[in-house]
């Protein structure tokens, strides 16, 4: 499979609109409060009859400083004692949820996200992993995908060693930009020494994969400053890059109101940055996975994509399509069977529900048959840039051309523009269409029209 990209400025201008990132379909906006504790328990019971491995996501919400660009669910505090009651309740939730799942179901994927997971000290991290191991079947052979997000500003070599000993084998670190003016504008002061020390320690302690997060479109960024940041990181050759377009949505995220809109780079500069990093990463030997993600050709994501086994969920791209995803901690989102479930967002609600022995469910949604069909279509397109109609027809007992008659008509314009090739049996996304894969997927999203302004721009 060709894993390259092509930068076509005219096409990008024409199709640059707001749209979902499709870590799920339906998107999280379709979750509703009518989904209950009992509904979640019922889906777990049904899931156990099918069996299969699990993926666990733990949300550690604490950060000791606020990054103005951040759209994550977080709690800002420099008082480390605030983590103590949260960790106690998280362990109770792990016990409640873990005991509902068949203990023979192996955890093939595990992720600590946030917030800042390294807000916890070593004793707390050890406790969290021990409780998890007690109530879920964790792997002991180091063959699972156990990943953790770290903040280089507060992560030292000893912390990296401790995380590796706890069983983590993949690490992701936020960087965003090295330029001092940009860092000051977003309130994230992070030195090169701190960043590269974490990358070096991760390799020295045997982490199998390192990922670096960068954001373009931040205030005061230029092509030159971002290129300088990227060149320095490339010297350390991380296994993966996640390079996101900053979505400025101050009406939804209060911390973004600290950013001066006049300092944000115009669309033309963003596009120049996009073209620059695409060229640099390709020249450095990385392949384009999709949706702002690049990886080395021998990385598991790149291999899975070439073999047609790549998947996408709330954690991003994954090689574990067969796992039920269990969300733990406030705001976490999971997928069990054909349902999406989100936990409550406020600590007091979380505490109250856990103390009553209830699962801390806030919202959820049961997928109907149409949702399942469209989810599979979007997943295939966003992961493999190709969709074979016969596979969908066989899986769901439909006639693709009849079921998606309107959508196929709407794809005609994209075919004329050179984004894709549409035949009687398939959709093949062209190299020029890969950066615009969200637009192609949006054609199949029946919920989109009234929700479009709540999403970021596709470029």
Question: Model features per residue range: what roles?
Answer:
Residues 392, 408-417:
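Basic amphipathic alpha-helical segments that dock to polyanions
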Residues 415-425:
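A short, conserved structural fragment
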Residues 45-46, 76-98, 106-401, 458-459:
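C-terminal scaffold of the Radical SAM
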Residues 1-54:
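Flexible, acidic/Gly-rich N-terminal and inter-domain linker regions that tether
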Residues 434-459:
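Short, amphipathic alpha-helical interaction segments positioned at domain boundaries
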Residues 426-430:
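Minor-groove-contacting beta-hairpin "wing" of winged helix-turn-helix DNA-binding domains
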Residues 52-87, 180:
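Canonical Radical SAM [4Fe-4S] cluster-binding loop centered on the CxxxCxxC motif
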């Amino acid at each position: 499979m060709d894993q390259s990209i092509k930068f076509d400025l005219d096409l990008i201008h024409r199709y640059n609109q707001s749209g979902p990132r499709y870590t799920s379909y339906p998107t999280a906006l379709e979750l509703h409060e009518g989904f209950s504790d009992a509904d979640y328990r019922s889906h777990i019971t049904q899931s156990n009859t099918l069996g299969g491995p699990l993926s666990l996501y733990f949300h550690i919400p604490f950060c000791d400083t606020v990054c103005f660009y951040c759209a994550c669910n977080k709690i800002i505090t420099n008082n480390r004692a605030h983590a103590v009651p949260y960790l106690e309740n998280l362990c109770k939730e792990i016990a409640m949820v873990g005991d509902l799942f068949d203990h023979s179901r192996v955890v093939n994927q595990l992720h600590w996200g946030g917030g800042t997971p390294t807000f916890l000290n070593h004793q707390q991290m050890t406790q969290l992993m021990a409780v998890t191991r007690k109530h879920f079947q964790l792997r002991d052979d180091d063959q699972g995908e156990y990943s953790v997000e770290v903040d280089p500003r507060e992560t030292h070599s000893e912390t990296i060693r401790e995380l590796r000993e706890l069983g983590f084998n993949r690490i992701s670190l936020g960087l965003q930009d090295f330029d001092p003016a940009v860092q000051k504008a977003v309130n994230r002061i992070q030195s090169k020494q701190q960043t590269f020390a974490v990358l070096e320690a991760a390799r020295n302690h045997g982490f199998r994969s390192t990922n670096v997060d960068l954001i373009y479109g931040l205030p005061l960024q230029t092509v030159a400053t971002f290129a300088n940041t990227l060149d320095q990181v490339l010297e350390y050759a991380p296994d993966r890059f996640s390079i996101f377009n900053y979505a400025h949505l101050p009406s939804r995220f209060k911390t973004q109101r600290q950013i001066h809109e006049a300092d944000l780079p115009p669309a033309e500069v963003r596009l120049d940055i996009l073209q620059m990093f695409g060229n640099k990463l390709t020249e450095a030997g990385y392949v384009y996975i999709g949706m702002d993600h690049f990886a080395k050709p021998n990385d598991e994501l790149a291999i899975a994509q070439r073999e047609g086994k790549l998947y996408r969920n709330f954690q991003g791209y994954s090689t574990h399509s067969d796992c039920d995803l269990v969300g733990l901690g406030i705001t976490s989102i999971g997928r069990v069977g054909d349902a999406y479930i989100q936990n409550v967002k406020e600590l007091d609600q979380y505490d109250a529900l856990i103390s009553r022995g209830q699962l801390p469910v806030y919202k959820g949604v049961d997928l109907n048959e149409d949702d399942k069909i469209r989810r599979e279509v979007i997943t295939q397109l966003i992961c493999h840039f190709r969709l074979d109609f016969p596979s969908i027809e066989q899986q769901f007992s439909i006639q693709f051309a009849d079921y998606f008659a309107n959508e196929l008509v709407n794809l005609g314009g994209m075919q004329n523009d050179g984004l894709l090739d549409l035949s009687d049996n398939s959709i093949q996304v062209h190299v020029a269409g890969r950066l615009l894969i969200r637009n192609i997927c949006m054609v199949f999203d029946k919920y989109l029209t009234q929700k479009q302004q709540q999403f970021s721009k596709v470029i």
